[in-house]
Amino acid sequence: MINWVLLLSFLTVALVANVPAIFGKCIDENGKEHDVGETWQGDECSKYECFVSEDGNYYYTGTGCPSFGVPPECHLEAKSGDFPECCPSVTCPEE
């Protein structure tokens, strides 16, 4: 059980989105401009990075906490801070 819990803590969810660009910057979902290579924290527990592809399109990648089933005897414990420290962890009773 302990190994399973530790494995889950290292899994993340990632996305890549083609985004509007102006003057060589990515525009995020809140309308804020970001330079290529810049990383920023999302509204929730997530992290984003702006990049430009070989074809000249601007994208940002987003990485967030995984969602997974929690065994009935366990629960999710909320965390704070920047990604990935803010991702919840699974807490189970000692065996």
From Swiss-Prot:
It comes from the Eukaryota. Expressed by the venom gland. Contains 4 disulfide bonds. GO terms for molecular function: toxin activity. The keyword Secreted applies. It is found in: Secreted. Its main location: secreted. Residues 1-16 form the signal peptide. Keywords: Disulfide bond, Secreted, Signal, Toxin. Pfam families: SVWC. GO terms for cellular component: extracellular region. Belongs to the scoloptoxin-16 family. This is U-scoloptoxin(16)-Er12a. It comes from Ethmostigmus rubripes.
